[in-house]
Each structure stands twice: as C-alpha cells, then as structure tokens.
Amino acid sequence: MENRLNYYKIERDEWSNFYQEHIVPLTEEELLNLKSLNDQISLKDVQDIYMPLVHLLRIHLDSHQELQDSQSEFLGVKAQKVPFILGIAGSVAVGKSTTARLLQSLLSEVYPDKKVQLITTDGFLYPNQELKRRNLMERKGFPESYDMRRLLRFVNDVKNNLPAKAPVYSHKVYDIVKGQYEIVESPDILIVEGINVLQLPTNQQIYVSDFFDFSIYVDAEESLIEEWYLERFETLLDTAFKDPTNYYYPYAIGDRKQAIKMAKNIWKTINLKNLREFILPTRNRADLIMHKTNNHVVNELFLRKY
C-alpha cells in the first residue's frame, strides 16, 4: 500500500482482501435495478469494492454513535440520535447515482433495524423558470444554479431530527417536479448524492459538507467521463422516442448525428468546464476517492489518513 500525501493509495486487489466475511446480499436482477442507465457493475464489483466499503462505513458509524453517547454523558444530558450523513460527489455521468443506490441497499441489509434514506441535490436546482429569469439556463449545474440556502436548511433540519423535504428533479422533463417532495424524517443514515456536495460556496459561512460524517468522490479520467456521458445521452434518446412528453423526444426523433454533435458541445462548454472549475477541485476534500477506469471498473481507492 503506497502512501500519497494525506491518502493511502490502495489497489483493487488489496482493497478486496480487507473484508470477505459476508456474501453479497443481492441478486443479479436486484443489482440491475440499482444501476444507472449505462453504468456497468457486477456482483464481483460489489463483493470486491462495496462490501469492504460498507465495513469501513460501519466502523465510522459505530465511532459516530460512540462519540454522541460520550459527549452526551459529558454534558449530563440524554443522548439524542444524530443522523449519520454520507456525501457522494463526482462529475456528471461518472456513476454517483449507482454508488449511492447500491450503498443504500447494502447498508439497509447490514443494518435492518436502521432507516437509510437517499436524496440527490438535483432537487435543489432552481426550477427552469427561475433559471431563465436569472439568465442561468446555460449555467445549469454550475454552483449559482442551485438554491444552496435551501439545501443547507435541509441538511441542518435532518441533523436536528426535524422533518425535512427535498424537491424532486426529473431527468425526463429536465426540471423540478412541481409539488413533489422526498420526505426525510429521522433517518439513521442519509446519503446525499450530487456534483456539488463538497463545494465551498463563496457566499456561505457554513458548507453542506460540514454536516457530513463521511464523504466519497467518484473519480475517472476526463476522456472516460465524456465517453460515458455520450453513451448515456444516446441511451436516453433510445428510450425517449416513444414519449412526446420527454425532454429528449425532439432529439430522439431528429437527426441522430446532429443530436450527438449537440451533446458533445454541451459536454465541452458546460459539463467539462464545470468539472474542471468546480467539481474536480473538491476531490481532495473527500474521505475516500474511488477511481474508475474502462467500463466503470474501480481500479484503485484513496483513503484519507487523518
């Protein structure tokens, strides 16, 4: 195991040997339902990468609870349940959603008596109407397109065991779904997934990541992420051509080459720019970096030392 800055660099084979006591509690069909459109993951990936990760999270969860109990004893007050919040960051199309859903499923199996919930920060984007009013549609996904105050209130309420609700975002309509919310109420574990969860907004005195008990950054080379982004775009077109209400319908029934050309331009002018300027700089704030190579295979991990 190579030491690198303030991270341990751990190759896949070494990581997979850290914890082999439990068999993967998933079937192929269940795993298929958890993965995103064009993401690739196998039961072997779950066994080699995610089962050791769940064991590591269990160590942090136990430490989290022990700290809360000890601090309450020190203060002479009754111990309160404080939700454990796990943040998952990374570029568009890198596979964050699959990682988040898979961890939710595995943690629910490991902790059958605990409530494990998941939300994405997509729901805290301003609605398209508001983005247009602010002339921000071309900046959708950049820091200024999110209602960060609302997101901060949300995670603060969760930490304080107050009922909280997260707006729902639909990739089908490419907008916030009016009147729909994900209700989060007294979870034991909350997973917060999004490109912006480790960012440091310049106009805030407190950050979303201040509420995290553990954070993961899903990483890959730019060229691979672009490839996955374009693959996902084509998959969306393949599923949208029968649904006129789908945001991608006009592109699905139009000239495919022109649609792909447009997607490449969006990648270059928006997603790649956002990755380089605002997402990648947050990588070294994560507790764990999961690095992917071809076919979404995790080939190495970087675990923060302290």
Curated annotation (Swiss-Prot):
InterPro entries reported for this sequence: P-loop_NTPase, PanK, PRK/URK
Pathway the protein takes part in: Cofactor biosynthesis; coenzyme A biosynthesis; CoA from (R)-pantothenate: step 1/5
Top-level lineage group: Bacteria
SUPFAM superfamilies linked to this entry: P-loop containing nucleoside triphosphate hydrolases (SSF52540)
Record has Acyltransferase as a keyword: no
Subcellular location: Cytoplasm
Keywords from the named record: ATP-binding, Coenzyme A biosynthesis, Cytoplasm, Kinase, Nucleotide-binding, Transferase
GO biological process: coenzyme A biosynthetic process
Binding site for ATP: G90, S91, V92, A93, V94, G95, K96, S97
EC numbers, comma separated: 2.7.1.33
CDD domains, sorted: PanK
Alphabetized GO MF terms: ATP binding; pantothenate kinase activity
Keyword ATP-binding applies: yes
Reactions it catalyzes: (R)-pantothenate + ATP = (R)-4'-phosphopantothenate + ADP + H(+)
Pfam families named in the record: PRK
GO CC aspect terms: cytoplasm
Cysteines paired by S-S bonds: none
Family according to the record: Belongs to the prokaryotic pantothenate kinase family.
Official protein name in the record: Pantothenate kinase
Source species: Ligilactobacillus salivarius (strain UCC118)
